[in-house]
Regions:
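N-terminal secretory signal peptides that target proteins for export/translocation
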Residues: 1-6
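Bacterial N-terminal signal peptides
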Residues: 11-20
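Conserved beta-strand element within WD40/beta-propeller blades
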Residues: 30, 74, 120, 166-167, ...
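Beta-rich, blade/repeat-based domains predominating
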Residues: 38-41, 58-78, 83-84, 102-125, ...
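A short loop-to-beta-strand structural motif that recurs across blades of beta-propeller domains
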Residues: 41-44, 84-88, 132-135, 172-176, ...
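A short beta-strand motif characteristic of beta-propeller blades
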Residues: 50-56, 95-101, 142-148, 182-192, ...
Length: 293
């Protein structure tokens, strides 16, 4: 059965008030809304020693990612000209710029490939199902349509072979896009229960795809799929898990985005421990690891 996730549910992110308690080799970046104003969004950064600071501000930030050159990209939407999506670029040195635009769209997931191209999923404001268009932005900002999804789509992630995966919550399907843009179904609705829709995506070093699911809080789950699509449950008992990211040591970090206010970042270690990495957050969404800035 199709389950439609209303966009307004995910227009709220939050500022981090919690303090990281574990140090890691790379910094952890988190997109945060703060409130429902154009000025409330920000990106927080945790240093390897666990110190948190605000890296940047941006209206309605969502997906975040680094490329191989150390450029940091943010999927942002300007609500003053609703909806106007923009991919923001933060180089290792220099000033913020706009890599590209997507008019009348709300941007969600974002990912980069090894060639430095940026992929962002834009939810069409005129579509009743908020159908997704995956735009490809070349390093010079040239925009092309890489692919489409039938319904509201959240997370994007690349596997090691250069295939792009997209979590379509409306169709309850994970779509796989070959490097040439050919779309196939990786797993469909039968891979999920009637109370699960896919949201965040992250690959581990073995090529397994981790999928956060929404719709059954406070007993939401993270599922894991092998490269051939065989699924199993990684963990349950979560509250609205969304963005995920692995650190260099293979620990999984998950943002719990509580719609009524609050949220945290959980760490699942390779030893099987579940740790609250940061608490007291107000609706965190997407995560990524990258070099200190």
């Amino acid at each position: 059965m199709k389950t439609k996730i209303l966009r307004n549910t995910f227009l709220n992110l939050g500022m981090i008030f919690g303090l990281a308690i574990t140090a890691h080799a790379q910094n952890l970046y988190v997109s945060l809304q703060g409130d429902l104003t154009n000025e409330g969004g920000s990106i927080s950064e945790y240093t390897p020693t666990g110190v948190q600071q605000t890296f940047a501000t941006a209206p309605f930030p969502r997906g975040i990612a680094f490329d191989n050159s150390g450029n940091f990209f943010v999927a942002s939407t300007d609500a003053k000209v609703w909806d106007h999506g923009r991919v923001l670029k933060f180089p290792p040195s220099g000033h913020q710029s706009v890599l590209g635009n997507a008019a009348r769209s709300f941007l969600e997931g974002l990912a980069t490939d090894t060639a430095g191209n940026v992929y962002a999923v834009a939810l069409e404001d005129t579509s009743p199902d908020l159908a997704g268009i995956i735009y490809k932005f070349a390093p010079d900002g040239t925009r092309t349509v890489f692919g489409t999804t039938p319904g509201q789509t959240f997370g994007l992630a690349f596997d090691g072979a250069g295939n792009l995966y997209a979590a379509d919550a409306f169709d309850v399907t994970i779509y796989k896009f070959a490097p040439d843009g050919t779309r196939t179904v990786f797993v469909g609705p039968s891979a999920f229960t009637s109370t699960q829709v896919p949201a965040g995506l992250a690959f581990d070093s073995s090529g397994n795809l981790f999928v956060s699911t929404l719709g059954n809080r406070p007993n939401d789950a993270i599922l894991v799929f092998t490269p051939t699509g065989m699924g199993s449950t990684f963990v349950t008992g979560l509250n609205n898990p969304h963005g995920m990211a692995f650190d260099a040591a293979g620990n999984l970090f998950v943002a719990e985005t509580i719609r009524d206010g609050g949220g945290d970042i959980l760490e699942f270690t390779t030893a099987g421990q579940r740790i609250v990495f940061a608490s007291g957050l107000n609706r965190p969404e997407y995560l990524t690891f990258g070099p200190p800035r």
